[in-house]
């Protein structure tokens, strides 16, 4: 009972910390899977031939003909052979990457209840649509599709007696007991389980769904561990299988992605997860994904896209901002060649340009990403989010407002965050410009609290943060107390200063804005928010100065915040986040031991503040990178 209780709570933590913490739709075409630690696969591609990425050779134009040729009448119960399932799923992936989303679904739909790979591909696209739209009907459709997919995969799994079912897969007998088709069924079943678990968490916030979702993750995790052992056995005995490379690709994708995702979690959560058998190893995860990417399986592209998501998105939001742009560019190059107008490919291309500091180029690519297709508006919303931030970085406030307004009107992902950002951006404009928009800033801030939502039983951290900040405009107060630089504060929360650090001109312009706010504060009458506002300005000023290579002045700003700790009344998050910035500053000056000491102080001495989990993610990433040299 104790283990079950731990399992329930800890698996909820996994989703709270990874799926919820990012607070924005994922950028990869499918959720990631599970892993095992301590089993290192010797790579036959140790040099990670990122230039040797293999795409499915199937011609997307031949999809209808192939479907008719490779299968039998759908009215029969005949199973589709493994070769046909793999080929058509590869074609569907190419269609998806070419923005032909409906074509991909229609190719897979007729055989989704007969073929495990048709079922996996079809349900994955439906689930992705549900996650991106956040419409309740789409979520229900996704759950239904994934339930059917699990039933289809179950048809192909090896059947065992009641007695045998009490033992693990490998202890039931020798490797020869599993046919090649049954091995693939295990991989497909594990992938479907994990996706269904994700939707179970999103669907409702009751405890029963928590337990159901947690057990699905646990089962998926165990299947991947067992498949990894099978993979090693096949390699050891040099057994011949026609589609071994596809099975290997599935194992590398699942174990690699799960290793990578679990390694991101704060140390205290990892220790608890290890108690019930979970573990994560970042180097092993990246190695497995790189090996999968350099293979020729259908999942090679998915391994690449997972690494790209890690480098271009996760490393920035949940990390230190130290991104392996070079590897991201190498991985993306063959995608750009084969899918030059693919929305997902263009999105990654724009993200890479953004991380390099090429904001103008990124802006153009994001706009192109919007223009190339109308079928899935959800990709537009991803681009609007990025375009909004680019304009914030450039302080083009009216244009930033335009994109924030589009998000408020069209996207359901986080209305509270969108409305808060719209109000925050309007707060940066002169009053006459705000009047021209026909918006009321106070009214917008007051709407935030009513728009917050819960996922997996938890509020989104950024929404909770927005709600707390918006309380200064509450109707219960005698008068609103204006927020200071709210758009730049949110920019800091999303690690935007890391991107701006590549551009001296933008950092200088931001410093001017911050110093104007600093001067305005000094001329205002003292109130209960004054110390908090002053400390926020000092933190933002320190970030600008650090980006401009003025470390001594930056350190003075940061120290002011830390020394004001006992005077803060509301924004207690400022001190631990400032300690993180001090650590980053010392690390840039080569004082690694001092930097680590500040990280540990921020991690161990503070709790129950806004965005605590986000900071713990960043601390974990920094400790991982700074304590030893890394080739990531």
UniProtKB/Swiss-Prot annotation:
SMART domains, per the entry: TPR (SM00028)
Pfam families referenced in this protein's UniProt entry, alphabetically: Iml2-TPR_39, TPR_8
TPR repeat spans: 343-376, 535-568, 576-609
Keyword Transport: no
Signal peptide: none
Alphabetized InterPro entries for the sequence: Iml2/TPR_39, TPR-like_helical_dom_sf, TPR_rpt
SUPFAM superfamilies xrefs: HCP-like
UniProt keyword terms in alphabetical order: Lipid metabolism, Repeat, TPR repeat, Ubl conjugation pathway
Record bears the keyword DNA damage: no
Biological process annotations from GO: cholesterol homeostasis; lipid metabolic process; negative regulation of cholesterol storage; regulation of cholesterol efflux; regulation of cholesterol metabolic process
Family: Belongs to the TTC39 family.
Function: Regulates high density lipoprotein (HDL) cholesterol metabolism by promoting the ubiquitination and degradation of the oxysterols receptors LXR (NR1H2 and NR1H3).
Protein name: Tetratricopeptide repeat protein 39B
Recorded name of the encoding gene: TTC39B
């Amino acid at each position: 009972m104790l283990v079950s209780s731990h399992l329930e709570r800890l698996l909820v933590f996994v989703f709270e910390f990874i799926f919820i913490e990012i607070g924005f739709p994922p950028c990869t075409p499918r959720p990631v899977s599970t892993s095992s630690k301590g089993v290192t696969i010797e790579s036959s591609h140790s040099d990670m031939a990122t230039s040797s990425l293999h795409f499915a050779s199937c011609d997307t134009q031949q999809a209808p003909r192939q479907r008719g040729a490779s299968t039998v009448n759908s009215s029969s119960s005949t199973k589709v052979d493994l070769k046909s399932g793999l080929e058509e799923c590869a074609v569907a992936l190419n269609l998806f990457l070419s923005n032909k989303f409906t074509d991909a679904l229609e190719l897979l739909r007729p055989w989704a209840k007969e073929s495990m790979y048709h079922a996996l591909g079809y349900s994955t696209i439906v689930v992705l649509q549900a996650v991106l739209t956040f419409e309740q009907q789409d979520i229900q459709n996704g759950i239904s599709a994934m339930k059917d997919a699990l039933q289809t995969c179950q048809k192909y799994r090896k059947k065992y007696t009641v007695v045998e079912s009490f033992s693990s897969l490998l202890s039931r007998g020798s490797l020869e007991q599993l046919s090649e088709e049954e091995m693939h069924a295990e991989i497909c079943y594990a992938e479907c389980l994990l996706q269904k678990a994700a939707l179970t968490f999103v669907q409702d916030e009751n405890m029963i769904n928590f337990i159901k979702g947690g057990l699905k993750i646990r089962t998926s995790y165990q299947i991947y561990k067992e498949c990894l052992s099978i993979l090693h056995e096949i390699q050891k005995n040099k057994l011949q299988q026609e589609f071994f490379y596809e099975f290997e690709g599935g194992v590398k994708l699942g174990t690699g992605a799960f290793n990578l995702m679990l390694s991101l979690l704060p140390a205290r959560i990892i220790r608890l997860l290890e108690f019930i058998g979970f573990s994560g190893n970042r180097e092993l995860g990246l190695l497995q994904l790189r090996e999968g990417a350099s293979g020729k399986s259908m999942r090679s592209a998915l391994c690449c896209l997972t690494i790209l998501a890690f480098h271009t998105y996760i490393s920035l939001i949940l990390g230190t901002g130290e991104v392996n742009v070079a590897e991201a560019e190498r991985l993306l190059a063959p995608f750009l060649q084969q899918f030059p107008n693919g929305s997902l490919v263009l999105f990654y291309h724009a993200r890479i340009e953004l991380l390099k500091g090429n904001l103008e180029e990124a802006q153009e690519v994001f706009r192109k990403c919007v223009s190339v297709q109308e079928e899935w508006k959800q990709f537009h919303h991803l681009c609007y989010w990025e375009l909004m931030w680019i304009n914030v970085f450039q302080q083009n406030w009216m244009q930033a407002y335009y994109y924030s307004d589009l998000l408020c009107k069209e996207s359901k992902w986080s209305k509270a965050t969108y409305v808060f950002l719209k109000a925050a951006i309007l707060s940066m404009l002169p009053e006459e410009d705000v009047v021209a928009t026909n918006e009321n800033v106070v009214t917008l801030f007051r709407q935030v609290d009513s728009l917050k939502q819960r996922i997996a039983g938890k509020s989104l951290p950024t929404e909770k943060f927005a709600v707390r900040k918006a309380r200064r405009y509450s109707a219960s107060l005698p008068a609103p107390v204006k927020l200071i630089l709210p758009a730049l504060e949110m920019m800091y929360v999303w690690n935007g200063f890391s991107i701006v650090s590549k551009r001296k001109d933008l950092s200088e312009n931001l410093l001017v804005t911050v110093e104007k706010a600093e001067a305005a504060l000094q001329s205002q009458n003292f109130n209960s928010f004054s110390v908090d506002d002053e400390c926020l300005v000092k933190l933002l000023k320190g970030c600008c100065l650090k980006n401009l290579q003025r470390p001594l002045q930056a350190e003075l700003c940061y120290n002011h915040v830390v020394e004001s700790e006992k005077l803060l009344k509301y924004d207690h998050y400022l001190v631990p986040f400032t300690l993180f910035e001090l650590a980053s500053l010392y690390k840039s000056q080569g004082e690694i031991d001092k930097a680590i000491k500040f990280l540990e102080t921020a991690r161990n001495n503070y709790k129950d503040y806004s965005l605590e989990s986000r900071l713990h993610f960043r601390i974990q990433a920094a400790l991982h990178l700074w304590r030893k040299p890394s080739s990531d």
